[in-house]
Amino acid sequence: MKTYYEKDANVDLLQGKTVAVVGYGSQGHAQAQNLRDSGVEVVVGVRPGKSYEVAKADGFEVMSVSEAVRTAQVVQMLLPDEQQAHVYKAEIEENLREGQMLLFSHGFNIHFGQINPPSYVDVAMVAPKSPGHLVRRVFQEGNGVPALVAVHQDATGTALHVALAYAKGVGCTRAGVIETTFQEETETDLFGEQAVLCGGVTALVKAGFETLTEGGYRPEIAYFECLHELKLIVDLMYEGGLTNMRHSISDTAEFGDYVTGSRIVTDGTKKEMKRVLTEIQQGEFAKKWILENQAGRPTHNAMKKAEQNHGLEKVGAELREMMSWIHAPKELVKK
């Protein structure tokens, strides 16, 4: 595994260049501010609206996406996956110049062919492995979060060096930047989200909650046992792996882990995981998601509404009112 650190990157490669950060959401605001604090000239390309005003208030020169691309030598695409291809076609493609670098923090649109940059530009990825607020906070504390780096197209012969300079400007070389490919990052990221982090976990939590409530137990108790305490366990795994978690829980819980876990996640579950991975690798999920967006998201919106009305959500909202240490956001935001 090739990993790059501070000594392997030179942020001075960005001196005399302008970086255009396209999008000013969670990652956009963090990466733009970190780069600026590292002495890099940054402009923000967004359409008029809330993000435009926030970027202006943060002191950036804000302009249209097309103008930002014309101004910059390095263009970082930090829009949501489903918006990138349209914005690229409408505002970026015709403004690209020979020798520019087009950067991404997720490989979806390049890997699945939704964006096909011309051969005369560099195409690379710098993907911090943390949400934007953490990218910014850790940087301000003098540290950094790990990241992935990949080069899809090296027109200039310096794509990796410039990508590492960008990663250093964001603060990621302080922690370590791991070399990967667009294919590996995209396919593993989608699989992790679907099979484990989002799809797998939410299905497991709901199934546990439903099993207890259908067995006659009160929803409030089921919520605590199947959702609320999940954070306690995940934090232990996050800090020191499965061994640390098992060392920290009771012996009763640890024994139950060993003898019961494989009854829940069975060989059949793993076979289904492999099917999910194959669908991702073959582009079936990407095609489904692209078509879903083109159709106005009817399935997505219907499923989202149904999930929001699940009994788990109702009792959870009531119980969280008892928890003074939880500061629920006034509006849900994408991280």
Swiss-Prot record:
Any one of the GO CC terms: cytosol
Location of the KARI C-terminal knotted domain: 181-326
HAMAP family given in the database record: IlvC
Annotated organism of origin: Bacillus cereus (strain ZK / E33L)
Known function: Involved in the biosynthesis of branched-chain amino acids (BCAA). Catalyzes an alkyl-migration followed by a ketol-acid reduction of (S)-2-acetolactate (S2AL) to yield (R)-2,3-dihydroxy-isovalerate. In the isomerase reaction, S2AL is rearranged via a Mg-dependent methyl migration to produce 3-hydroxy-3-methyl-2-ketobutyrate (HMKB). In the reductase reaction, this 2-ketoacid undergoes a metal-dependent reduction by NADPH to yield (R)-2,3-dihydroxy-isovalerate.
Catalytic residues as annotated in Swiss-Prot or TrEMBL: 106
Cofactor binding description: Binds 2 magnesium ions per subunit.
Binding positions for NADP(+) per the UniProt entry: 24-27, 47, 51, 81-84, 132
Family: Belongs to the ketol-acid reductoisomerase family.
Pathway named in the protein's UniProt entry: Amino-acid biosynthesis; L-isoleucine biosynthesis; L-isoleucine from 2-oxobutanoate: step 2/4; Amino-acid biosynthesis; L-valine biosynthesis; L-valine from pyruvate: step 2/4
Keyword hit for Metal-binding: yes
Domain spans labelled KARI N-terminal Rossmann: 1-180
Signal peptide: none
Residues given in the record as Mg(2+) 1 binding sites: 189, 193
Biological process, per Gene Ontology: isoleucine biosynthetic process; L-valine biosynthetic process
Catalytic activity: (2R)-2,3-dihydroxy-3-methylbutanoate + NADP(+) = (2S)-2-acetolactate + NADPH + H(+); (2R,3R)-2,3-dihydroxy-3-methylpentanoate + NADP(+) = (S)-2-ethyl-2-hydroxy-3-oxobutanoate + NADPH + H(+)
EC number: 1.1.1.86
InterPro entries per the UniProt record, alphabetical: 6-PGluconate_DH-like_C_sf (IPR008927), KARI (IPR013023), KARI_C (IPR000506), KARI_N (IPR013116), KARI_prok (IPR014359), NAD(P)-bd_dom_sf (IPR036291)
Official protein name in the record: Ketol-acid reductoisomerase (NADP(+)) 2
